[in-house]
Amino acid sequence: MASDSLPFEILLLSPCLLPGQTYFKESKASVKVEPQAGETILFFNIDDQSNPGCNLRQFLWGTETGQKICDLIVFYAKESERIICFVELKDNISDLGHGTKQVINTYNTFKGHLQKSYTAKAFIYACTGALPYEHEEYQRKLLKEFGKNNFDFNNRSNDALGDLLRGIPPKTGAGKRKNKK
């Protein structure tokens, strides 16, 4: 079963791991999780365009080009719970469709290398913009792949990613509101 652990060997033993960091910023968008007592949270920058030292893309797809990969994998553990969250950051939520493809494609390829002893989640965050008309279609795709309460997008709460990891439902109206005037 050595091949089952290989993705985590790549993540842990390469520049993919962001040691001691629970904050990540790409362009204008960022995410942060404040660890609580008893939690282990690891951030992995897996996008080889922003982190050329991470070889996860080559492991998952070899020399095949054009595959969509998300920005981060966040590993969360507390007591016996293990969560692997696939995270994509966008400057504008109009890119929600592309972000949805990135997290789903990364998850579907990644899960083929692991035993299902974890909960998979997805988080897509954009710092600006109104939800695209097709957002319900993307929501259905995420629901199909990750299940109810295992994904969130455009939730602008400061602790939205931490809440998702901990299983705390989104605050009322978060991620659903229109631009205020």
Regions found by a protein language model. Give the residues of each.
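Domain-level recognition of nuclease-like catalytic cores that cleave nucleotide substrates
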Residues: A2-L13, A120-K181
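Active-site metal-binding core of divalent-cation-utilizing nuclease and nuclease-like domains
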Residues: V31-E79
